[in-house]
Regions:
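C-terminal signal-anchor/stop-transfer transmembrane helix together with its immediate cytosolic
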Residues: 1-37, 275-316
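DG-centered beta-turn motif at the end of beta-strands
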Residues: 24, 47-49, 89, 139-143, ...
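Alpha-helical transmembrane signal-anchor/signal-peptide segments
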Residues: 32-50
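…and closely analogous acidic/polar surface helices at protein-protein or active-site interfaces
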Residues: 39-40, 52-86, 105-110
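Juxtamembrane amphipathic/hinge helix adjacent to a transmembrane helix
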Residues: 41-43, 253-293
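Second-shell loop/turn segments in exported
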Residues: 56-66, 76-77, 99-104, 120-129, ...
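Short beta-strand-loop
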Residues: 86-119, 142-143, 273
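VWA/integrin I-like adhesion module and closely mimicked acidic/polar interface patches used
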Residues: 158-243
Length: 316
């Protein structure tokens, strides 16, 4: 044994080359070890109501609507998710949430997910109303039809149209399973008028203050879910309704249902909040060692042949 150690010490270069060769051969065999990892599944819901057309956000210095900003933020977020993560997309309008598809693997379906995001449009909305609070119940109903658990990430400005009153504020105490959800606030605290477009995206004007109120006689029919609002355009700049990020109401709603809240203007804050959400499940998966072995072999070879290293060894 002592003789072998002496030989290896006296023939260090040969020994290291042999080790590098062994590591490369092992790397070619693609060995792996089982590791336990968390699998995350997200249901990303996008508010496509008309207040999301408000232009009070910016991307690289360019003013954009809240909806365009949401899509941009989702592109960034999805691109950063590791393979194995599943993502499903949904749209919110009125009181309802619809699922475009169940959560699918981000790597295997990356192009399809990105293409779907690119085509999200406010004109897909099926009503002009925006009842964010009630949509929490609708979201839970959608999740019940999913083949496996998923965590909700709900992007919205929190704008309620028509405005909430005591008779049309839905009690959320009966909502079950929302403890891991994440509400993401989109919009500025300064706000801007809500544009009203034609179905060809031509600007007609801006929603008035009156348009955000309940239509006459709405209180008696609130319980029946038949609330409507006025459809008035602002006659002048002073009459335009300014929509701000309803952060306080979203924070209150998140607290009521046991969810978390974060602003969407920070990618890092959003990613951190999503990482804190509970995984859909845990599973054992193979971790390939070939890259680790190949890297180790490469470092050995670099250590042997770098001129500066040989120079240092020459002074010893």
């Amino acid at each position: 044994m002592q003789a072998m150690l002496t030989y290896l010490k006296n023939n260090r270069d040969t020994t290291l080359l042999g080790c590098a060769l062994i590591l490369l051969v092992l790397a070619l065999l693609q060995p792996s070890i089982p590791v336990k990892r968390n699998i995350y599944s997200y249901f990303l819901v996008i508010d496509i109501t008309q207040s999301m057309n408000v232009v009070d956000m910016s991307i690289n210095g360019k003013a954009v609507s809240r909806l365009e900003y949401t899509k941009h933020r989702l592109h960034e977020t999805i691109s950063s998710l590791p393979c194995g993560t599943k993502v499903g997309l949904g749209l919110f309008s009125g009181v309802n949430v619809v699922s475009l598809y169940f959560p699918i693997d981000v790597c295997e379906n990356f192009s399809s997910i990105k293409d779907t995001l690119d085509h999200v449009d406010w004109r897909s909305a099926w009503t002009a109303d925006s009842r964010v609070r009630e949509s929490m119940l609708a979201t839970a109903q959608v999740l019940n039809n999913f083949p496996e658990p998923a965590q909700v990430v709900f992007f919205s400005d929190g704008e309620e149209a028509p405005k909430l009153h005591s008779f049309n504020t839905r009690d959320l105490s009966t909502l079950q399973g929302a403890g891991g959800w994440l509400l993401v606030g989109i919009g500025s605290m300064q706000g801007a008028p809500i544009p009203k477009f034609t179905d060809k995206n031509q600007l007609l004007g801006y929603w008035s203050h009156e348009s955000m109120q309940l239509a006459t006689g709405a209180a008696p029919i609130a319980a029946a879910g038949l609330l409507t609002r006025k459809n008035d355009l602002a006659e002048n700049a002073n009459d335009r309704y300014v929509a701000k990020l309803s952060e306080a109401s979203m924070q209150t709603m998140a607290k009521e249902i046991g969810a978390s809240y974060v602003r969407g203007d920070s990618l890092q804050a959003l990613q951190t909040a999503m990482e804190k959400q509970a995984p859909a499940r845990s599973e054992w998966a193979p971790f390939n060692l070939n890259s680790v072995l190949a890297l180790a072999a490469g470092l050995i070879l670099i250590g042997l042949y770098l001129p500066w290293l040989r120079l240092i060894r020459g002074f010893k």
